[in-house]
Amino acid sequence: MRLIIEPNYEQLSKWAANYVAAKIKAANPTAEKPFVLGLPTGSSPLGMYKNLIELNKQGVVSFQNVITFNMDEYVGLPKDHPESYHSFMWNNFFSHIDIKPENVNILNGNAEDLEAECASYEARMKAVGGVDLFLGGIGPDGHIAFNEPGSSLSSRTRIKTLTTDTIIANSRFFDNDVNKVPKTSVTVGVGTVLDAKEVLIMVNGHNKARALQQAVEGAVNQMWTITALQLHPKGIIVCDEAACADLKVGTYNYFKDIEKDHLCPCSLLK
C-alpha cells in the first residue's frame, strides 16, 4: 500500500485530482471501452472535485467516456433534497464537467425494493467491466462509505443502519439537528470497493489521525474498515501532515523517503 503525505489539504486535493486525470488520460477511454470511476461524497473529496473541474475546463481531461458509480446514498431523502448525495454530486461536480448524465450511477435511496436496487447496482458495475479506480474518504472511526465499524470486509452493496457517531457527524449538514439526519443508507460494501482495480483514499485533518494510524500500522480489522485496504494490490492513501499525528516516526519517514519523487502533484501530469 502506498502512502502519499502532502503538506496540507490543498496539495492533497491537487495530487488526488492529478492522479485521477492521469489515469483517465492513460486509459484513453472510448464509448465502447469507458473508464469506470467510483466516487465519494463528504468534505474530503471537495478539493479534488474543484481541481478536476479546472482540469476539465482547461482541456487536460475529459469525462465524456467516463462512467461513475457513487459509494452511497441516504434512504428516504428525496433526490432533490439539498443534502442528498444526488444533489451533492451534481452541485459540486457533475454539472461543471462534460460527463454524460446517462453515465452517472447513484444508488436510489427511494427505491420501492432497496435490496433489488443494491443487487442491480452490483450488476451494473459488473456489466461495464468493473471499477477501474475507486476514490474514497474515511470517517474518524475509519469507516469507508457507510461501512461502519463491525462491517464485514467482504460485504457487498446493501442497506446499512448509521451509527450515532455518524449521525452526529452528519448533523452539521442538517442544521445541527440529529433528528433530521436519515438513520439508514444504501452503500457499496467493503468487498465492492476492494473489487476495483485501484483504490485511492483521501485522509485529512487531526481528527482522522487515529484512523490513518490504524489503516497503515494496524492489523486488518472489521472495527476499522479502512484497514481492508491493506489487502488490495493497488491501494493508495493520500493524506496531509495533520492526519499523520499518530503515525510512528519511523513509518512517517519511511513513506516520505520512498515516495519523495512522487509527492509533487505536477509529477503526475506530464
Swiss-Prot record:
CDD domains: GlcN6P_deaminase. One of its GO terms (cellular component) is cytoplasm. Keywords: Allosteric enzyme, Carbohydrate metabolism, Hydrolase. Gene3D superfamilies: 3.40.50.1360. The record marks S151, R158, K160, T161, Y254 as: Part of the allosteric site. GO terms for molecular function: glucosamine-6-phosphate deaminase activity; identical protein binding. It catalyses: alpha-D-glucosamine 6-phosphate + H2O = beta-D-fructose 6-phosphate + NH4(+). Allosterically activated by N-acetylglucosamine 6-phosphate (GlcNAc6P). The active site is at D72, D141, H143, E148. Pathway: Amino-sugar metabolism; N-acetylneuraminate degradation; D-fructose 6-phosphate from N-acetylneuraminate: step 5/5. PROSITE patterns: GLC_GALNAC_ISOMERASE. GO terms for biological process: carbohydrate metabolic process; glucosamine catabolic process; N-acetylglucosamine catabolic process; N-acetylneuraminate catabolic process. Its EC number is 3.5.99.6. PANTHER family: GLUCOSAMINE-6-PHOSPHATE ISOMERASE. HAMAP family: GlcN6P_deamin. Catalyzes the reversible isomerization-deamination of glucosamine 6-phosphate (GlcN6P) to form fructose 6-phosphate (Fru6P) and ammonium ion. Belongs to the glucosamine/galactosamine-6-phosphate isomerase family. NagB subfamily. This is Glucosamine-6-phosphate deaminase.
